[in-house]
């Protein structure tokens, strides 16, 4: 009798779950990422290895670290990505402001993960630039900017704060995985992930590693000019292709607040309708416009909370409106996320 070409369902599942190890022509070198890993054949340590071509074309099994990441982040209720298509629109500044906004409620615990590997600015803005990473039997301990605000960044690992990080993609991806797998985040109400501009390896890695544990969505940051909106359209397209919900769009630097009289005037003209019109065109929520206040830069330079230092600023009131709009988009009670009694 001719053998059947149909495999048993259980054996098929077993093969998919346990792919065969590729036949190597040389022993695995030191620092090898593993012949079955997602980085096999592409990592920096693979350069010059006789097995590189074999590993690069071999079938890849599921990443064994994904379940560990999911378990590590099981105590995190909400995960939010902060994205911008263009650099210089104030994305990291907005991340720090959003973190302080959430942390104004003492009942909430907030974490910020800085994945802008080559330009880590979050520690400076949150006042923990001089901190270092402490390693214990339970993992890496984040730095605490406040009793309820934790921070993790590559800045804590640099011997000198002005050292440049010159890394290729696989090494960046490895560090992001460590931030998720090895950092003892504990129980958090919100984990904010600050990302670099564009759609690079860092964005793909964060999406891959967090997909199983669940991402609430992404907040887009732009300025009113069309040159910024052009890149935001690409970023929104990236999110839709990657299966990431876009929670809303924030228009930063929408005006200028005079520090003397607090009058607001327009500097960057919304030549094509600005963020509000783009949000309508793309079918996403418009969370609000935040004016440019020089005191925001001052608060970030000193690592202080803008909300505590300048509660009467129009920018402060606008940011609180953005936070409440974001809470609504996430299905949360805005008055619980940012209680009314905390308003100026």
UniProtKB/Swiss-Prot annotation:
Annotated signal sequence range: none
Does the record carry Nucleotidyltransferase as a key word? no
For this chain, one GO molecular function annotation is: metal ion binding
Cofactor binding description: Binds 4 [4Fe-4S] clusters per heterotetramer. Contains two stable clusters in the N-termini of NBP35 and two labile, bridging clusters between subunits of the NBP35-CFD1 heterotetramer.
User: Could you say which residues bind ATP here?
Assistant: 85-92
Annotated binding of [4Fe-4S] cluster 2, by residue = 258, 261
Q: How does it assemble?
A: Heterotetramer of 2 NBP35 and 2 CFD1 chains.
Q: Which InterPro entries does UniProt cross-reference here?
A: Mrp-like_CS, Mrp/NBP35_ATP-bd, NUBP1/Nbp35, P-loop_NTPase, YlxH/NBP35
Q: Which family does it belong to?
A: Belongs to the Mrp/NBP35 ATP-binding proteins family. NUBP1/NBP35 subfamily.
Identify the stretch(es) annotated as Disordered.
19-43
HAMAP family linked: Mrp_NBP35, NUBP1
Annotated residues that bind [4Fe-4S] cluster 1 are located at 32, 46, 49, 55
Q: Which GO terms describe its cellular component?
A: cytosol
Cofactor(s) needed: [4Fe-4S] cluster
Protein name per its UniProtKB record: Cytosolic Fe-S cluster assembly factor nbp35
Gene3D superfamilies in the cross-refs = P-loop containing nucleotide triphosphate hydrolases
* Compartments where found: Cytoplasm
Query: Which CDD domains does the annotation name?
Result: Mrp_NBP35
One GO biological-process annotation of the entry reads: iron-sulfur cluster assembly
Listed A to Z, the keywords are: 4Fe-4S, ATP-binding, Cytoplasm, Iron, Iron-sulfur, Metal-binding, Nucleotide-binding
What are the cysteine partners in each disulfide bond?
none
